[in-house]
């Protein structure tokens, strides 16, 4: 194919040529990688993401290093080790690639909810990107929003709460906050999260999270079920 303009704001494709097959490796999902790195930072842990490429999310790994995580990369993937309480980082300003991705703003915010100090987030790509904030506040987070700016002041601890996902990345942020909170949190609206993450609950459980799926019964009693048709995720200590 005759394609030009890679790396610019305009890509031109000239037709007319016979195409042939090839072998191509699809690039890894950098936002999914950022989410799992922030999960380790939020709950405190050690994670290795096979196939992840730091060059695709260097602004995220830089923020995690500044927060106190040990992040290393090799030809096979990225490792993040986060054992100590995190510290606040310099202003996080979303920008087009290769700047800080707007889709990683919410999950990094979740990772910094218990950090020492205050972190300023500035959303420069989309409007209404802080819809997850009110739900995080229900879990004990200290966040002030003014227009495009959100200031996150770290707290000593988060507590469990019933919360509702209203969008994909905000829902992922609620799941990460629930990992770090005391008690069991229930997340409604998880269909938003499932739209962008394959088996998020299974992968988090594989990392040691206590996470299960529930569906409200007609009698009003919540029952657990292993099927994929779910309305709620519960994260925390099982009763």
Indicate where each model-derived feature is located.
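Short, structured segments at the rim of ligand-binding sites
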Residues: 1-239
């Amino acid at each position: 194919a005759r394609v030009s303009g890679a790396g610019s704001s305009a890509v031109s494709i000239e037709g007319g040529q016979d195409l042939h097959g090839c072998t191509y490796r699809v690039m890894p999902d950098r936002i999914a990688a950022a989410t799992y790195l922030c999960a380790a930072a939020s709950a405190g842990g050690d994670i290795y993401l096979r196939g992840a490429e730091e060059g695709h999310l260097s602004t995220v790994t830089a923020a995690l290093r500044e927060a106190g995580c040990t992040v290393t990369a090799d030809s096979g993937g990225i490792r993040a080790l986060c054992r100590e309480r995190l510290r606040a980082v310099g202003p996080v300003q979303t920008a087009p690639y290769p700047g800080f991705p707007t889709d990683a703003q919410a999950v990094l915010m979740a990772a910094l909810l218990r950090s020492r100090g205050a972190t300023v987030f500035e959303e420069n790509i989309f409007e209404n990107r802080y819809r997850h904030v009110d739900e995080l506040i229900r879990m004990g987070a200290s966040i002030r929003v003014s227009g495009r700016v959100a200031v996150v002041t770290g707290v000593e601890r988060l507590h469990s709460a019933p919360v509702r996902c209203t969008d994909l990345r905000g829902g992922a942020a609620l799941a990460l906050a629930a990992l770090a909170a005391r008690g069991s949190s229930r997340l409604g609206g998880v269909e938003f999260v499932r739209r962008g993450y394959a088996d998020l609950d299974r992968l988090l459980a594989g990392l040691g999270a206590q996470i299960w799926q529930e569906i409200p019964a007609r009698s009003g009693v919540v029952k657990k079920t292993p099927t994929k048709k779910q309305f709620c995720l519960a994260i925390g200590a099982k009763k």
